[in-house]
Regions:
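The feature marks proteins involved in alpha-glucan
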Residues: 1-3, 30-114, 119-124, 131
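Short proline/glycine-enriched turn/loop motifs at strand-loop junctions of beta-rich domains
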Residues: 5-12
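Short beta-strand elements bearing conserved aromatic residues within extracellular beta-rich modules
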Residues: 12-14, 55
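A cross-taxa feature marking solvent-exposed loop/turn segments within ectodomains of secreted
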Residues: 21-23, 50, 143
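Beta-strand-rich interaction surfaces with strong enrichment in secreted/lumenal proteins
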Residues: 25-29
Length: 286
């Protein structure tokens, strides 16, 4: 079964390679609380809906029919030919964390090396989690650091944003590799005595409709305030409405997810001034 909450949506379907991309074959049901759900009988989908399957939502809202990626997707990939992003059902064998009992508090005062996984390599092109693990972590350790801070690594469509225009908050950037390769990076860092800090972006999200969570239910205020109040003009992005219970649940579950699933040791929260001030930190006090 699968469950989504789309309060402003009129109709929601789920489709993918498991049903030959038939958009309106599997209709989700909405309950009294605005939660949409669909049930997939095991006997029917055991051999079709499996690890690696691709899927999307077909959502009918006030902005028409849109093909969307679920907000809680844990793996999102880009088609090389069309450049479109699609959610991927990701259910590999459980990662072996045996022996990873790292305690960052024992490192004392932190000497933090900040790095961008894709840009830290000497080669031309986008670096990978595996390359960072094999080539960069030993250098960080050798130079005397005891912590590494990874710049924004959640899925993002525009590489030039350095990862700060997030589209899928629960999915590691697929251009750098698989979730398991990111987990291996963290595990190896811990073996070297390095704490791993994640740069977490909860101040805003990308405006894109095809890839992101903007207007996911067909309204402009599903995760944000309506109109200009939900727009960050300096970053050309959308602002979260932290007063909504659902937004708080979404962001807090995201905090817990990266700690539990990837064993990150802590966070550096990006754009905090934009989260707590109406002027977003762009103000002249003279």
């Amino acid at each position: 079964s699968d469950v989504y909450k789309r309060q402003g949506a009129h109709d929601v379907y789920v489709f993918g390679d498991f049903n030959n991309w038939q958009r309106t074959e599997i209709r989700m049901q909405r309950d009294a609380h605005g939660v949409w759900s669909a049930f997939f009988p095991e006997a029917m989908y055991r051999d079709r809906l499996r690890h690696g399957s691709l899927y999307k939502l077909h959502v009918h809202g006030d902005n028409g029919w849109k093909d969307r990626i679920p907000a809680y997707a844990t793996r999102v990939v880009q088609d090389e030919a069309t450049k479109n992003y699609t959610a991927q059902f990701w259910a590999p064998e459980p990662f072996d964390w045996q022996g990873d009992a790292f305690d960052a508090s024992k490192n004392g005062s932190l000497m933090i090396y900040e790095a961008h996984v894709g840009m830290a390599q000497e080669k031309e092109g986008v670096g990978t989690y595996r390359e960072f693990t094999e080539k960069i972590l030993p250098i960080i350790k050798k130079d005397g650091y005891n912590a590494v801070q990874l710049m924004a690594i959640a899925e993002h469509p525009y590489y030039g944003s350095f990862g700060y225009h997030v589209s899928s908050f629960f999915a590691p950037a697929s251009r750098c590799g698989t979730p398991e390769e990111l987990k291996e990076l963290v595990r190896r860092a811990h073996e070297l005595g390095l704490a791993v800090i994640m740069d977490l972006v909860h101040a805003h999200y990308v405006r894109n409709l095809n890839e992101g969570i903007n207007e996911l239910d067909g309204t402009d205020h599903h995760y944000s305030l309506p109109g200009k109040a939900g727009y960050q003009p300096y970053w050309d992005s959308k602002l979260f409405d932290y007063g909504k219970d659902e937004v708080q649940h979404f962001l807090l579950s995201n905090v817990k997810y990266w700690l539990d699933e990837f064993h990150f040791d802590g966070y550096r929260f990006d754009g905090v001034t934009s989260m707590i001030y109406h002027h977003h930190g762009y103000v002249d006090f003279d």
